């Protein structure tokens, strides 16, 4: 029988050379660039908004899975400052998504003890989106578990520019001198500044859909993050894919510019 709307097979992550160790080190802060909703829909000859809706369901699944694994902060790149360039109908749908997401998922977040935060330029969001964000933050403010941190109308260059302007104003007001500015000063003024110092920078950054670029996301904070790229489109991203990424992280030697813990041999890479 002819199929006019063929369904592409669900993406299956290639077998990892590493096994996930649930007793091993779990990244305290994981950031994800959720990419591929539109392509997922197009592969199925569906409108792009169908991919965004499916992607919202993936957010729910991954949020709970990450929380159960012991992740402390999950930062999700939901809408960039550049995404306003997309077709109006798609942008309008994306602005409604947080409303639908929080209205249906906040009760589960409360049950899971997950706390919601949203970083970005919220003042430019439609009023109904702002209201949904405020409600979710208020309803989960007393939760003490994982922080679900959405980057909504966020761009790292704009974030850095805003921080520099705030610091310049404080120097002008003689709160401190230019010579007293430190990396911590800058970090305090970034949108992740609400987090404890040890949780501000993601240990692991994941990007879906096979693209291998950062797309103006957390440029300051990911200086020493481990990067993991998967071909899985975001709606196909699963708990198993998350564990594959963490397994890769668990088998990396994070040196932060220093030497490996094992004895270095002459002629080895000094980087």
UniProtKB/Swiss-Prot annotation:
A GO biological-process term: polyprenol biosynthetic process
SUPFAM superfamilies reported for this sequence: Undecaprenyl diphosphate synthase (SSF64005)
CC cofactor note: Binds 2 magnesium ions per subunit.
Transmembrane domains' residue ranges: none
Gene Ontology MF terms in the entry: ditrans,polycis-undecaprenyl-diphosphate synthase [(2E,6E)-farnesyl-diphosphate specific] activity; magnesium ion binding; manganese ion binding
CDD domains found in the cross-reference section: Cis_IPPS
Function recorded in the entry: Catalyzes the condensation of isopentenyl diphosphate (IPP) with allylic pyrophosphates generating different type of terpenoids.
Name of the molecule in the record: Isoprenyl transferase
């Amino acid at each position: 029988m002819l199929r006019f709307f063929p369904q592409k097979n669900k993406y299956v992550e290639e077998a990892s050379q590493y096994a996930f160790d649930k007793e091993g080190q779990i990244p305290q802060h994981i950031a994800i660039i959720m990419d591929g909703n539109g392509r997922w829909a197009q592969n199925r000859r569906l409108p792009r908004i169908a991919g965004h809706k499916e992607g919202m369901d993936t957010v729910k699944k991954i949020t709970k899975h990450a929380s159960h694994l012991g992740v402390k902060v999950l930062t999700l790149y939901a809408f960039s400052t550049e995404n306003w360039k997309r077709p109006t109908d798609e942008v309008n749908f994306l602005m409604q998504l947080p409303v639908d997401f929080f209205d249906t998922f906040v009760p589960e977040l409360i049950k899971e003890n997950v706390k919601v935060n949203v970083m970005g330029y919220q003042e430019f969001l439609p009023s109904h989106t702002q209201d949904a964000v405020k409600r979710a933050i208020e309803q989960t403010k007393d939760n003490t578990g994982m922080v679900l941190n959405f980057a909504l109308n966020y761009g790292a260059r704009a974030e850095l520019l805003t921080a520099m302007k705030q610091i310049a104003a404080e120097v002008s007001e003689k709160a401190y001198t230019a010579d007293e500015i430190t990396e911590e000063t800058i970090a305090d003024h970034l949108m992740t500044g609400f987090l404890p110092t040890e949780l501000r920078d993601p240990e692991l950054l994941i990007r879906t859909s096979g693209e291998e670029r950062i797309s103006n996301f957390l440029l300051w904070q990911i200086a020493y993050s481990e990067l993991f790229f998967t071909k899985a489109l975001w709606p196909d991203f699963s708990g198993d894919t998350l564990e594959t990424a963490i397994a890769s992280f668990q088998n990396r030697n994070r040196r932060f510019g220093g030497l490996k813990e094992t004895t270095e041999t002459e002629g080895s890479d000094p980087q």
